[in-house]
Amino acid sequence: MIDKPKLMAHLRTIPDYPVKGIVFFDVTTLFKDAECLKMLVDDLYEHYKDKGITKVVGVESRGYIAGAALALRLGAGFIMARKPGKLPAEKLSESYSKEYGTDSIEIHADAIDENDVVLIHDDLLATGGTVAATYRLVKRFNPKTVYMSFNIALDDVPKLDIYPRDAETYSILHLTEHDA
Protein backbone atom coordinates (compact mmCIF):
# COMPACT_ATOMS: atom_id res chain seq x y z
CA MET A 1 0.00 0.00 0.00
CA ILE A 2 1.37 3.38 -1.00
CA ASP A 3 1.66 6.03 1.71
CA LYS A 4 1.79 9.11 -0.52
CA PRO A 5 2.40 11.59 2.34
CA LYS A 6 5.42 9.54 3.49
CA LEU A 7 6.81 9.35 -0.04
CA MET A 8 6.23 13.07 -0.58
CA ALA A 9 7.96 13.87 2.72
CA HIS A 10 11.05 11.98 1.48
CA LEU A 11 11.05 13.35 -2.08
CA ARG A 12 13.52 16.19 -2.60
CA THR A 13 12.85 18.80 -5.28
CA ILE A 14 15.47 21.16 -6.67
CA PRO A 15 14.40 24.23 -8.65
CA ASP A 16 16.34 25.34 -11.72
CA TYR A 17 18.30 22.08 -12.01
CA PRO A 18 19.95 21.05 -14.29
CA VAL A 19 18.96 24.27 -16.08
CA LYS A 20 16.85 27.30 -15.20
CA GLY A 21 13.12 26.63 -15.41
CA ILE A 22 13.33 22.88 -14.68
CA VAL A 23 12.16 21.47 -11.34
CA PHE A 24 14.24 18.35 -10.61
CA PHE A 25 12.48 15.62 -8.62
CA ASP A 26 15.31 13.83 -6.81
CA VAL A 27 14.20 10.24 -6.13
CA THR A 28 17.51 9.35 -4.47
CA THR A 29 16.00 10.58 -1.21
CA LEU A 30 13.24 7.97 -1.61
CA PHE A 31 15.79 5.22 -2.24
CA LYS A 32 17.87 5.99 0.85
CA ASP A 33 14.85 5.35 3.10
CA ALA A 34 14.33 1.57 3.38
CA GLU A 35 10.57 1.87 3.98
CA CYS A 36 10.09 4.13 0.94
CA LEU A 37 12.17 1.87 -1.30
CA LYS A 38 10.26 -1.20 -0.12
CA MET A 39 6.96 0.60 -0.69
CA LEU A 40 7.94 1.44 -4.28
CA VAL A 41 9.15 -2.07 -5.13
CA ASP A 42 6.19 -3.77 -3.40
CA ASP A 43 3.72 -1.60 -5.31
CA LEU A 44 5.38 -2.34 -8.65
CA TYR A 45 5.49 -6.05 -7.82
CA GLU A 46 1.78 -6.16 -7.00
CA HIS A 47 0.98 -4.44 -10.29
CA TYR A 48 3.18 -6.69 -12.47
CA LYS A 49 3.31 -10.07 -10.68
CA ASP A 50 0.76 -11.70 -13.01
CA LYS A 51 1.98 -10.18 -16.31
CA GLY A 52 4.60 -12.84 -17.09
CA ILE A 53 7.51 -10.38 -17.12
CA THR A 54 10.74 -12.11 -18.18
CA LYS A 55 13.01 -9.04 -18.46
CA VAL A 56 13.05 -5.68 -16.70
CA VAL A 57 14.91 -2.92 -18.53
CA GLY A 58 16.14 -0.24 -16.12
CA VAL A 59 16.82 3.16 -17.67
CA GLU A 60 20.13 4.77 -16.64
CA SER A 61 20.64 5.30 -13.92
CA ARG A 62 17.85 5.85 -11.43
CA GLY A 63 15.72 3.25 -13.20
CA TYR A 64 18.24 0.64 -12.07
CA ILE A 65 17.45 0.77 -8.37
CA ALA A 66 13.76 -0.16 -8.24
CA GLY A 67 14.07 -1.94 -11.62
CA ALA A 68 16.71 -4.41 -10.41
CA ALA A 69 14.88 -5.01 -7.13
CA LEU A 70 11.65 -5.60 -9.04
CA ALA A 71 13.34 -8.01 -11.48
CA LEU A 72 14.59 -10.02 -8.52
CA ARG A 73 11.09 -10.15 -6.98
CA LEU A 74 9.53 -11.15 -10.32
CA GLY A 75 12.15 -13.80 -11.07
CA ALA A 76 13.03 -11.89 -14.25
CA GLY A 77 16.32 -10.91 -15.83
CA PHE A 78 17.55 -7.33 -15.55
CA ILE A 79 18.82 -5.30 -18.52
CA MET A 80 20.60 -1.96 -18.23
CA ALA A 81 19.70 0.70 -20.79
CA ARG A 82 22.85 2.83 -20.76
CA LYS A 83 24.19 6.08 -22.07
CA PRO A 84 26.61 5.83 -25.03
CA GLY A 85 29.99 4.20 -24.55
CA LYS A 86 29.17 2.34 -21.32
CA LEU A 87 28.40 -1.14 -22.69
CA PRO A 88 31.38 -3.29 -23.75
CA ALA A 89 29.78 -5.70 -26.24
CA GLU A 90 27.76 -5.30 -29.45
CA LYS A 91 24.84 -2.98 -28.81
CA LEU A 92 21.84 -1.28 -30.36
CA SER A 93 21.33 2.47 -29.93
CA GLU A 94 18.47 4.97 -30.13
CA SER A 95 18.64 8.79 -29.93
CA TYR A 96 16.17 11.08 -28.16
CA SER A 97 15.49 14.66 -27.08
CA LYS A 98 14.73 15.76 -23.54
CA GLU A 99 13.73 18.98 -21.78
CA TYR A 100 17.29 20.26 -21.74
CA GLY A 101 19.18 18.62 -24.63
CA THR A 102 19.66 15.47 -26.70
CA ASP A 103 21.15 12.08 -25.86
CA SER A 104 21.00 8.41 -26.84
CA ILE A 105 20.44 5.11 -25.06
CA GLU A 106 22.00 1.68 -25.71
CA ILE A 107 21.22 -1.95 -24.90
CA HIS A 108 23.39 -5.00 -25.59
CA ALA A 109 22.37 -6.65 -28.87
CA ASP A 110 21.77 -10.02 -27.15
CA ALA A 111 19.76 -8.67 -24.20
CA ILE A 112 16.19 -9.47 -25.28
CA ASP A 113 14.59 -12.13 -27.48
CA GLU A 114 11.22 -12.51 -29.17
CA ASN A 115 9.81 -14.69 -26.37
CA ASP A 116 10.41 -12.05 -23.71
CA VAL A 117 7.76 -10.00 -21.95
CA VAL A 118 9.56 -6.76 -21.12
CA LEU A 119 8.95 -4.10 -18.50
CA ILE A 120 10.82 -0.82 -19.00
CA HIS A 121 11.28 0.99 -15.68
CA ASP A 122 12.47 4.54 -15.08
CA ASP A 123 12.33 6.81 -12.07
CA LEU A 124 10.35 9.66 -13.59
CA LEU A 125 8.17 10.38 -16.62
CA ALA A 126 8.36 14.01 -17.76
CA THR A 127 8.28 14.66 -21.53
CA GLY A 128 8.71 10.97 -22.34
CA GLY A 129 11.77 11.42 -24.54
CA THR A 130 14.01 8.96 -22.71
CA VAL A 131 11.39 6.25 -22.35
CA ALA A 132 10.23 6.74 -25.95
CA ALA A 133 13.76 6.02 -27.17
CA THR A 134 14.05 3.05 -24.80
CA TYR A 135 10.67 1.74 -25.99
CA ARG A 136 11.69 2.05 -29.67
CA LEU A 137 14.96 0.30 -28.86
CA VAL A 138 13.25 -2.56 -27.01
CA LYS A 139 10.66 -2.96 -29.80
CA ARG A 140 13.52 -3.58 -32.26
CA PHE A 141 14.05 -6.92 -30.45
CA ASN A 142 10.42 -7.92 -31.26
CA PRO A 143 9.45 -9.09 -27.75
CA LYS A 144 5.95 -10.45 -27.09
CA THR A 145 4.88 -7.45 -25.00
CA VAL A 146 6.40 -4.24 -23.65
CA TYR A 147 5.13 -2.50 -20.51
CA MET A 148 6.40 0.75 -18.97
CA SER A 149 6.51 1.81 -15.32
CA PHE A 150 7.66 4.85 -13.38
CA ASN A 151 8.07 5.82 -9.75
CA ILE A 152 6.71 9.28 -10.61
CA ALA A 153 4.76 10.71 -13.55
CA LEU A 154 4.66 14.49 -13.95
CA ASP A 155 1.16 14.79 -15.34
CA ASP A 156 1.35 18.51 -16.16
CA VAL A 157 4.45 18.21 -18.35
CA PRO A 158 3.37 17.85 -22.01
CA LYS A 159 4.47 14.55 -23.53
CA LEU A 160 6.40 14.61 -26.79
CA ASP A 161 4.62 13.40 -29.92
CA ILE A 162 7.01 10.42 -29.96
CA TYR A 163 5.83 9.17 -26.54
CA PRO A 164 4.46 5.61 -26.99
CA ARG A 165 0.83 6.08 -25.94
CA ASP A 166 -0.10 2.55 -27.05
CA ALA A 167 2.05 0.87 -24.37
CA GLU A 168 0.45 -0.06 -21.06
CA THR A 169 1.97 2.35 -18.54
CA TYR A 170 1.84 2.43 -14.75
CA SER A 171 3.11 5.16 -12.42
CA ILE A 172 3.17 4.93 -8.64
CA LEU A 173 2.89 8.67 -7.98
CA HIS A 174 1.13 11.17 -10.23
CA LEU A 175 2.46 14.66 -9.50
CA THR A 176 2.62 18.09 -11.06
CA GLU A 177 5.46 20.57 -10.93
CA HIS A 178 3.33 22.45 -8.37
CA ASP A 179 3.88 19.52 -5.98
CA ALA A 180 7.54 20.57 -5.76
Positions of predicted regions on the chain:
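Active-site-facing substrate-recognition patch
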Residues: 1-53
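Conserved acidic residues
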Residues: 54, 116, 146
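Generic enzyme active-site microenvironment
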Residues: 58, 120-121
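Short, glycine/charge-rich flexible loops or terminal/linker lids adjacent to PRPP-binding catalytic cores
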Residues: 77-119
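Conserved G/P- and acidic residue-centered "switch" motifs that form tight phosphate/ATP-binding loops
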Residues: 123, 128
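PRPP-dependent phosphoribosyltransferase catalytic core
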Residues: 132-180
